[in-house]
């Protein structure tokens, strides 16, 4: 597994479809809601990248149990708990990536989406590229 695949595996581990931001609108199609979009980057040993991801959902006025900020915040909390205070390490080739919660910015926050019926929570993570896991 390479670092791209590891990030994809991590984000798909929360019961929602997850898409690299560069591929989410492949062939002009928008994915179904809810879903996760995430930034990805390849690094070398010793590098740290600050990346973001978003959980998206759509309010459907015809469905009573539709999207809510509460549900999105619970999902963000699940992701935060999975990363934990010590971070989450994943094996990548001869090394690995270490996903952490940044100390200098909030982990998750509601963000405007540009549409009244779309809800979005943006999350920031640090990814350290490490050798010899």
Regions found by a protein language model. Give the residues of each.
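Charged, amphipathic alpha-helical segments and their flanking helix caps
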Residues: 1-19, 39-133
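A short, polar/charged loop/turn motif at coil->beta-strand junctions and beta-hairpin connectors
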Residues: 29-32, 47
């Amino acid at each position: 597994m390479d670092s791209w695949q590891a990030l994809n595996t991590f984000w798909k581990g929360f019961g929602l479809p997850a898409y690299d931001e560069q591929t989410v609108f492949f062939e002009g199609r928008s994915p179904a809601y809810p879903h996760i979009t995430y930034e990805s980057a390849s690094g070398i040993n010793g590098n740290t990248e600050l990346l973001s991801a978003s959980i998206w959902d759509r309010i459907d006025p015809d469905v009573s149990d539709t999207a809510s900020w509460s549900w999105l915040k619970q999902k963000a909390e699940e992701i935060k708990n999975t990363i934990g205070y010590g971070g989450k390490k994943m094996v990548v080739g001869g090394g690995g990536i270490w996903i952490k919660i940044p100390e200098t910015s909030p982990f998750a926050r509601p963000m405007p989406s540009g549409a009244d019926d779309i809800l979005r929570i943006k999350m920031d993570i640090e990814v350290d590229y490490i050798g010899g896991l």
